[in-house]
Amino acid sequence: MDIGSIVAKYDVDRLSIATLASHSSLQIVHGAKLEGFRTAVITLRDRVWFYRQFSHLIDNFIVVDSWRDLCREDVVSKLREWYSIIVPHGSYVEYVGLSCAETIPIPIFGSRYMFSIEADQHKKMELLKNSGIPIPKIYTLNDEIDRLVIVKLPGAKGGRGYFLATSRE
């Protein structure tokens, strides 16, 4: 995939910012509007009613039955027609899958090569640690807990599967 050849065909005066409809998408399209861009939101069919209420922020909608439809040729064609640049958010890889996220032939704001790290909690924490960025202490079941901690269950996503604890019990 040669993103450069795709971008070369874009009319830079007609760029649009595209994102997946989620808790972060309204902030993304609001910022895009403030910067003078047109906007597009890809949304699930059962959620389109909600996002249509923000038509002052969203110029174009693509309605899909599954997030993984993002990589369908008709969806890609529509995004290219609108000269879209995808702005991913925290749910992007989880929603569309790593393969689609990395290979969709649409320009992405940021590095698509970071998606594999974003999708793997251990790789992500290792990168942060190696970069000198403080990360939370990781406890094992054998560790003594001496303060309030946030426990993340395996597979926890989207704010679910977490709880607070002050002891191993």
Where are these regions (language model features)?
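Short N-terminal or domain-adjacent regulatory/targeting segments
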Residues: 1-14
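Short, contiguous strand/loop micro-motifs
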Residues: 14-16, 111-112
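Conserved hydrophobic helix-helix packing surfaces used for dimerization/oligomerization
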Residues: 15-18, 149
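Short hydrophobic segments within beta-strands
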Residues: 18-20, 42, 156
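N-terminal basic/disordered segments at the start of proteins
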Residues: 19-39
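Conserved N-proximal alpha/beta basic substrate-recognition cap immediately N-terminal to
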Residues: 44-149, 156-157, 167
